[in-house]
């Protein structure tokens, strides 16, 4: 340990802040973990209690609002266009920029803007955070390859620069310049800066977080890897180090995908070290056993909708969209058991998830409002077609059918006597854990 006055505490260190990292973070918090959470991600929309190793040095400008797509600064006479999936910046007929939205996309909140040169190669990316200010800028070479990224404080001063060619990281702090050879050194410096010593490190990657663990002083050999990658035909080299007992601090591996865990055991991984562990989900409600079916779509291409509506006259179909609906879809108003919600607001969509007890993932094109996950969290029984399914993580494999076998879907919906059992199976397929499972880690 580098200093006796440091706070000794368990730490959760995440490689990025994608969906599975968020689920791990939420599982820890729900289970009562009150230690610090850090990430190598420079995401500008992190929860307030998650610290980026980069943007920590930029300070906070709280109270501002996230930037809407038409609030991007552009030269006079340039035009900004947007849909529910992204935006573009035009100079007459020339596309000069591309706008990427933060999730949920339909709110059109700006996350990143790519700026193109005259050959339509991205040369600069501007990064905006949840307070609406530009906190980072990425530079690309003329081939569109990453060169560097700078991070700024609220006054626009450059605080951190990462060179993607040399992998060096430069920190400008208190009129001094610090140079770090890699992200691992940089992360360790942040721990020192905050007077934190990780007594246990919980982490989810064999990349940077693993090397941070290996570079900390060994105390009790109690660090834990949460393995979130999918099925693969071999055991990763750094994982083998842990399995062979050669890691300085890590002694346990929790695998968060069933297929990946089964394969690791098949490959000879020690069952005492490698164990399955899913997530603690915050379920919003219980299934009420009503006859309400929900479909969320921005497309009028809904597989077998007509057949399902006709074959199940006693079921109420609620079809919602963030956009206006085409005449093709509006024509379903002729059925007494179909209710359409064009231009649906967030509050209305939430009410539908609370009202309905079945979700059909049968629409083509992109998924909206993270509908499959929301259906899962609201305990709707989820069914879909192979041709349309968006997120298999939360769906029982035997409830995903070929569209030609839609009658099998109907039989499951009609079989109300097995609804609770099927919901329990659905929760199991998503590896649902309870709070005590995480307290025992």
Regions found by a protein language model. Give the residues of each.
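Conserved catalytic-core segment of nucleotide-activated headgroup transferases in glycan assembly
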Residues: 275-331
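Nucleotide-activated donor-binding/catalytic signature segment of Leloir-type glycosyltransferases, i.e.
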Residues: 327-344
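A short, active-site helix/loop in glycosyltransferases that binds the activated sugar's phosphate group
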Residues: 238-271
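Short Ser/Thr-rich beta->loop micro-motif in glycosyltransferases that lines
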Residues: 360-364, 386
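A charged, aromatic-enriched C-terminal amphipathic alpha-helix characteristic of glycosyltransferases
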Residues: 411-441
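Short alpha-helical donor nucleotide-sugar binding micro-motif in glycosyltransferases
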Residues: 351-356
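Short hydrophobic beta-strand element within catalytic cores of glycosyltransferases
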Residues: 381-384
């Amino acid at each position: 340990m580098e200093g006796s006055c440091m706070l000794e505490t368990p730490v959760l260190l995440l490689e990025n802040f994608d969906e599975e990292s968020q689920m791990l973070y939420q599982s820890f918090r729900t289970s009562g973990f009150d230690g610090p959470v850090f990430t190598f991600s420079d995401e500008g929309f992190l929860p307030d209690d998650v610290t980026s190793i980069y943007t920590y040095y930029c300070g906070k400008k709280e109270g501002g609002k996230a930037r809407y797509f038409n609030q991007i600064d552009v030269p006079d006479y340039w035009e900004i266009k947007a849909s529910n999936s992204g935006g573009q910046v035009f100079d007459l007929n020339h596309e000069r920029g591309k706008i990427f939205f933060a999730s949920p996309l339909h709110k059109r909140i700006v996350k990143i803007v790519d700026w193109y040169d005259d050959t339509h190669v991205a040369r600069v990316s501007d990064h905006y955070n949840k307070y609406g200010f530009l906190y980072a800028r990425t530079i690309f070479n003329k081939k569109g390859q990453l060169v560097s990224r700078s991070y700024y404080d609220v006054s626009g001063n450059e605080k951190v620069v990462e060179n993607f060619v040399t992998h060096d990281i430069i920190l400008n702090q208190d009129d001094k310049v610090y140079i770090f050879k890699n992200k691992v050194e940089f992360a360790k410096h942040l721990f020192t800066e905050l007077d934190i010593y990780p007594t246990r490190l919980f982490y989810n990657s064999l990349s940077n977080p693993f090397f941070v663990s290996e570079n900390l002083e060994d105390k009790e050999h109690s660090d834990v890897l949460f393995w979130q990658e999918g099925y693969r035909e071999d055991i990763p080299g750094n994982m083998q180090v842990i399995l062979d007992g050669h890691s300085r601090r890590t002694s346990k591996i929790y695998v968060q995908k069933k297929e990946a865990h089964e394969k690791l055991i098949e490959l000879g991984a020690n069952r005492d070290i490698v164990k399955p562990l899913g997530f603690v989900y915050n379920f919003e409600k219980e299934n009420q056993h009503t006859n309400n079916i929900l479909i969320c779509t921005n497309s009028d291409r809904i597989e077998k909708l007509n057949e399902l509506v006709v074959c199940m006259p006693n079921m109420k179909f609620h079809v919602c969209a963030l956009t206006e609906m085409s005449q093709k879809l509006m024509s379903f108003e002729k059925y007494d058991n179909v209710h359409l919600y064009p231009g649906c607001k967030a509050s209305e969509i939430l009410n539908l998830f609370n009202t309905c007890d079945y979700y059909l993932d049968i629409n083509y094109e992109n998924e909206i409002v993270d509908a499959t996950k929301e259906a899962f969290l609201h305990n709707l029984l989820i069914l879909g077609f192979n041709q349309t399914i968006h997120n298999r993580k939360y769906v029982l494999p035997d409830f995903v059918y070929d569209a030609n076998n839609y009658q099998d879907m109907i039989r499951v919906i009609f079989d109300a006597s097995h609804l609770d059992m099927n919901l329990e199976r659905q929760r199991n397929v998503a590896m649902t854990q309870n709070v005590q499972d995480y307290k025992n880690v």
